[in-house]
């Protein structure tokens, strides 16, 4: 979870993981690094220009964007393997509220298991184990 723990008052940049129950969005993956098992979630390949806007001044705040962008954004295509598999957690999704927090994902953990900037991180083994059971109706509860 996030370095600042779990919060029901999540704000952009506070390093906390939002408290609540949320739907799951797209499964993003690095086709060059991961062979996907069967999965019922909608999928999208991460390309070199795939990003996620974390700049509340943008109309694309908390949405996938194409890089480069004049606004701040997380790059999803990384040297690190933490985003080889990621699922968008639908926090601050509909409607999007400026500065309430963005880019909350279920993704792979670092080897060191260090805290995230607000996401949920699990091992690749566990991610691949749960993936076949996830679908559009699946919810994640964070408490």
Task: Go through each PLM region and give its residues.
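Cell wall/extracellular polymer interaction/catalysis modules
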Residues: 1-117, 124-143
């Amino acid at each position: 979870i996030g370095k600042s723990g779990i919060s029901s008052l999540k704000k952009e940049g506070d390093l906390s993981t939002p408290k609540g129950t949320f739907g799951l969005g797209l499964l993003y993956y690095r086709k060059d690094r991961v062979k996907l098992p069967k999965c019922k979630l909608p999928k999208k390949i991460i390309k070199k220009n795939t990003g996620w806007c974390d700049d509340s001044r943008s109309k694309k705040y908390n949405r996938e964007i194409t890089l480069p962008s004049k606004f701040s954004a997380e790059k999803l295509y990384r040297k690190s393997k933490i985003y080889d598999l990621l699922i968008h957690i639908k926090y601050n999704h509909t409607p999007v509220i400026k500065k309430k927090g963005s880019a909350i994902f279920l993704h792979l953990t670092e080897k060191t298991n260090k805290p995230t900037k607000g996401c949920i991180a699990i091992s690749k083994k566990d991610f691949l184990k749960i993936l076949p059971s996830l679908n559009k109706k699946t919810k994640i509860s964070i408490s």
